[in-house]
């Protein structure tokens, strides 16, 4: 069965690029035609690139890797959080903080501080303090949760990142490239394909297009988790050490059942509205 269908892509508006005056010439090979001043993306190529990205993500996760989901623009925030949470992967859907990848040791300290403040609040650690102190601590906790909540369980830099809009997320892209972390991303007609390892030509401005493609990547993660669990079970039965792939953590086991039930076909049911166009 196809990972995603041409009809799903069309219904989500994935074929609509930017206005012809707002484009990156490097994207020419991914463009089918232009209509009314809007570039139309070649969805046949999109399908091919989706298969390649899907396989890479699935294999990466199956061998113990993790995928960070990144999308801070309004059109992507909800789907990034929803799909990453569905498969237990880290995500950033608010502001990207410089150093999230290249200075992860410092970021990890901020994560520990966030968890410390949460524990204080839950165990009565705020009691006996002045109202001003409690207010300051609460504000600090809320700020940390807003900016770092999506990566709270990330113990190390991810194996790869999924990006919606490489132009907006240029800081994340630059950090990933500096660390040689593979980048999977939607490539709209104004993007630079040279900075992406696994491109998916498509509309990164339409809510439904971003949601559909993010769901595809999350489903690849889910399949990878399932393969990892199966490999671990096989090795346990054979009495082997299982060093090739990391076993599933408890939270991954809990997520697995629900994660594998949702598939990209769900996007077809959301196709009642007309395709959204890029501005």
UniProtKB/Swiss-Prot annotation:
Signal peptide: none annotated. Residues 255-279 are annotated as: Disordered. It comes from Mycolicibacterium gilvum (strain PYR-GCK). InterPro entries: Ribosomal_uS2 (IPR001865), Ribosomal_uS2_bac/mit/plastid (IPR005706), Ribosomal_uS2_CS (IPR018130), Ribosomal_uS2_flav_dom_sf (IPR023591). GO terms for molecular function: structural constituent of ribosome. The keyword Endoplasmic reticulum does not apply. GO terms for cellular component: cytosolic small ribosomal subunit. Pfam families: Ribosomal_S2. Keywords: Ribonucleoprotein, Ribosomal protein. Belongs to the universal ribosomal protein uS2 family. HAMAP family: Ribosomal_uS2_B (MF_00291_B). The gene is rpsB. This is Small ribosomal subunit protein uS2. One of its GO terms (biological process) is translation. PROSITE patterns: RIBOSOMAL_S2_1 (PS00962).
